[in-house]
Structures are given as structure tokens and as C-alpha cells.
């Protein structure tokens, strides 16, 4: 059953303070939690104010001078009480000029002493002068708090801003905070930027910001963020190509020109083919200098693709450089080992295992004998001899071998 009221007014009404909100019908599972009270007699609603009652539908009244009569729209039954302070609108044409004087919606939700849901008051205000000159919409939504047994609070807050048409953007901000028990604080924040134009244009959706902070899971978060970037780039690229196909198809059908229109689809050059300026400079200069309705889509796509390609190029160059360095080290080691084998071939043939009671004296005598007998004087030959001693003996003798080798060389080659 719906309550319909028709009222004519020669002039827009003035804003008046809202009366106390009338009582509302609660769900059956919440009636036991609210103390029963005798509802007061609601005041007679004026022609510009319609309120909700216990057994009737909520009525929304909208005044429009161009229609010649008031428009009354019945909403679905609501379990929430709300009241309209005033609505004043002047509409000349839906697709042309839409000057708006003032619209303000005030609603009050009774405090529910329920362990799961807690709501508060809020309002919706809409003010502007001309639809094609300046249009602003702001929604201050009350905090929505959920409380679950053995869990912490979960808070969701939303805010909407609409600025048309010179800015051509609808900003929708959604913040979600989660607190998990037995864990550190988890912050999950999502920001959405939606580009919404008039019906004759298209609607585009861009994921503007995604932030997820989880302690001890930085690597997983980084991988998820990289995947999200890939999805965003694919989505934006698909929307951009779909828009161009749509426009070209419309032009062909209207002009009956079935010529070569496919190459014109990609007539705009991608920014990664222009290496003369940096991607950030191209990105921000394009956003500031252009005001067309698809500038943000193409700018974001081009910037992300450019940044990803440059990152891939840097990684490839670094990998190539590291590979070259590794190959050079391997060649040096190969030459060193080959030189060591060629210069110490006679030493290897004369190697023998010996049980020594004085290793330092035996190492010294052996080194002196090898240097004198083979007339070793070059630095490469001495280095090969040292590497031979180090490789043929256990690790615990390395310090002694190095010390004795230094003493032998200092004594034999002292000028």
C-alpha cells in the first residue's frame, strides 16, 4: 500500500529545520531489544515535507516547474525512518540545461541497541547553479559498524563527490579497515575513480588506488600489486580500444563509408614510441593540457605501459650486464686454471703424501727446494705454486702455508 500526495506550490519552499523523525517499524528479530514506548502523534506534514510512518510506504516528493505538476515517487517499504526537509529543483530539459537551486535530504535512523549493527545520523546535500557549468554532489554517509562475537570492529566509511562537466569525473572513495584477532593491524584501503558522463557518452571505470598492508607478508603483497597493475592496464586498454571501435563503427554507419577505417583506429601513437621525453612528464602534461572525456583513460594506460616497458628494458639490460660479467669471470678462471696446470705440471707429478711432525719446517723446506730446483722467478709461477700447495693440503694448514710462503718469497727474492 502506498501513500501518494500531490501538492502544487507557486514558488520553491524555503529550507526549514526538520521535526523529530517519526517512529519506524523494526524487524521482528530486533523488536525484543528495543524497549516498547508509545509513539507520539506525528505532526501534520506540510506540502513540502513527507515523512515515513509505521504502516505506510516512504514517500519522496520532488518539485519540477517544467513538468507543470508535482512528481510524487513512492519508494519501497523501508525499515528506516527518514524525513525530507525540502527539495527544490527547476528542470528545463533532461539533455540540455539543468539549473538546480537546492536539494537537501535529511534522515535519522533510530539507535538500535543490537550487538551486530550500530547506525547514526547523516544527510545528503546537493547544490549547484547550472548542470553544464558547475555541478557538485556530496554524500556524508554515517559510519557503519559491525560487531561480531570474539572479533574486533570492522568500520566502513564512504564519501562521494561529483564534479561535472569541465572536470568530467565522479570521485567515489571507499575506505575499509579490518582488525583481525590475534594478528597485527590489517589495513585494506581501496580508492575508486569513476568517469561518468552524460547518457550519450560512455561510462568508464578505473581502479585508482589499491593499498594492502599485511605484516610479515611483504613479498606476497608486492606480487599481488604487480598482478593488479597488469589487470588494470588490460582493462584500461580494452576500454580504450572498445571506445575507438564504437566511434569508428558509428561513423561508418552514419556516413556509409566502408573504406579503410581500421588503420585509423590506432592513429594515435603510443607514448612508449616517443623516447624524447620522460613518461611522468608526458603523463602529467597530458592530464593538465587535455580536457577531453577520454584523456584520463588513455593517459593512465599509456603511462602504465610505458613504465612497464621501461622496467622490462632495465631488467633485461641488467641481466645482460650480469651475464657478461659472469662470463668474463669464468674465462679468467679458465685461463688461470689452464696456466696453473701448464706451469705446475712437473709439480703435480712430484707430489707425494708425507707424515710430518713439524709441518711448518717441512712446508718451508719443500717450497725452497721447488723454487730453487725449477728456477721459479715469475709472479704467475709463484702464484701457481701457492695455489698448488693450498689445493693439495687440508684447510687447517692454509694459514700456515700462506705465512710460510710469504717468508720464503721475502727471503729468496729480497733485493
Swiss-Prot record:
Residues 10-25 have a biased composition (Pro residues). Keywords: Nucleus, Repressor, Transcription, Transcription regulation. The keyword RNA-binding does not apply. Its main location: nucleus. GO terms for cellular component: nucleus. The keyword Phosphoprotein does not apply. PROSITE patterns: OVATE. GO terms for biological process: negative regulation of DNA-templated transcription. Residues 316-326 have a biased composition (Basic and acidic residues). It comes from the Eukaryota. Residues 327-336 have a biased composition (Basic residues). Pfam families: Ovate. Residues 10-45, 316-340 are annotated as: Disordered. It is found in: Nucleus. Residues 352-411 form the OVATE domain. Probable transcriptional repressor that may regulate multiple aspects of plant growth and development. Plants over-expressing OFP9 have no visible phenotype. This is Probable transcription repressor OFP9. It comes from Arabidopsis thaliana. The lineage of its organism: Eukaryota, Viridiplantae, Streptophyta, Embryophyta, Tracheophyta. The gene is OFP9.
